[in-house]
Structure formats: structure tokens, C-alpha cells
């Protein structure tokens, strides 16, 4: 039977990508023989994908908003992890058969930067919808990229080259820019581009030939006979959407309303655990959210980097950081608050207890009072 949570997850991602959701959940068999899936077929959704015809807006290389259209999103089972070496390959079947969501994009991206930002936006959606942790280096989020060039004014695409082994955002940008330059050089010299699969070599910053592709394979799709189709009710679909956690862009808009800069909001949202910590810290007093954000980005991240701890391992409770930020808002200097911050981490207790331990007093800021002290002296 269908995995209910997988269906809910696919609906949430499809909605976030502005796709038209198909209420009919039906699976098909993709038949092929290859070492990545030994049973000889893959369960997928060729004819009834979860969603069709959506889009995602990103910031282009020129800083302007660019819309990337999305053809479809569908569920299918994962294949094994393959590690290729000079004269042998290793196959890890531990993830084979696990459900995944595949997003098929339209050919709207024109350079490595746009592709990188598109994948980054996808990652933000899957992380904040709790679909995946989005760790590309661990394979939780993967992408293959098809690159082809065409003359200016032409409506027909050139020969397609598929790129693999793109396990970071930086690799995506570098691999595409290199491949665009490589194909340009081929075409300008009169050498036709071959239809092939290439991998990105991180050490050299180049793409390397893996295999030459032949004509398209006929996978002979037919309905999966062992999984009955399900017609989802409108209530089920809307409930899946309504119960989706707050997504990256919605959180970012809210943080900007709190007074955070776009840069600070992006830094906090780059780590979902940091965003959760921030939410709890300013829950008592949203007026000091900007001060809390400054402590979080500078002092907390500084401590984490120095001590090699994750956000979940950071020892200071959220409300204590909020209390330290409140002291600064009440007139204590930033330097004094940093002393309190460090003392609480080292000795525990509340912000007020640390202030008393350190015998820190608020510095006088009344000019008349200061002038009176000067006259007395």
C-alpha cells in the first residue's frame, strides 16, 4: 500500500512549488536492467505525477527575480548508492526502495548561479517542510543537471549532456559554468557535442566523461499491479497543506518585519535548529528580536565555531539569551552583556545571577548626573 506520510510530503512540496496537484495517486513500473536496482524495475509515477506545471521564483545573476518553471513532481523508489573507481565499482543497497520525491524542472536556467540558487531554494522548501534534512553531501538531496547550448534566436536545444556527482551548491555552480565553457569551445571549433554523462571532479574543477549515451531507452511503463490506485479527497489534500510547517520564505518575511536585515534573516534560516532557537528566544518579547539575532549570529555562532558544537548542543537556554539581550536593551553595554553571556555558559544560572557574580552595574548615561559627579570631584 501507499506510504501515507510520503503522499502528504509530496503534496506539501507540490503546493510550495505552485504545482497543480493530482488527487489520483497511481504508480507505474519503469522496466530496465541495471545494477542500481537488482529487481529489474522501479516503482514510479510516469502517468499520474503528484503535481504538474508549477514554478519557483529565484534571484537571477543580475539581481532580478527570475521564474523557473517546473514540469512535474512525482514519487518513486530510490536506487542504490554507486561509488565508481578506476577499475571497479561499489554498490550500497541500503537506501534502495526508500520513497523519494523527484522534481523535474523546465530548461529555464542560463548559468551556474541560477541553477545553484534554484537548488538552494528547493533545499529551503524541503528542509522547512520537514521533507528532508537537505544535506547534499550525505545524499539527502541530490540533483542531476542537463546542459545544452543553442545559437542565439534558436528555439531548438542542442545535444544534451548530463552532469552527476554534484554534492554541494558550490559544485553545481562550478560544474555548470565549466560545462557551458567546454561545450562553447567545442561548438566554436566545429566539434559536435556528444550526448554523454559526465561527472564533476571537485579536485580539478572540471567535468569528466563517465559514459557516452545512445538513443533514448524504452522503459515500457505499465501500471504497478500490486499497489491499488487511491483517489484523494479534497479534504485530505487541504489538510496536508494546512498542517505543513511554516516555510523558509514565510519565516523570512516575518523576520524582516521584526527588524532583521535580509542578511541576518538568511544566516539564521540557514540552520533550521538556529531558527527554532531564535523563535523560542524572542517568544517572550518580539521587540528585542533584532538584539537577540545579533547575539545569536555573532556570540552564539562564535562559541559554536570555537567549540565545534551544533545548535542543539549549545548549552545556553533560549530564555537566558533573551534575558541577556533584554539587559542590553535596558542600558547595559554590549561588552557587559558579553561578559554575562560567557559567565552563564561557564558557571550556569540565570543572566541576573551572572550579573551579580560579576558585580556589573549599569553605566550612568544621564549627562546631568555625570556632570554633577565631575563638579564634586
Positions of predicted regions on the chain:
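Strongly charged, low-complexity linkers/loops
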Residues: 311-322, 329, 334-377
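Amphipathic alpha-helical segments within well-ordered protein domains
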Residues: 252-256, 279-283, 301, 322-328, ...
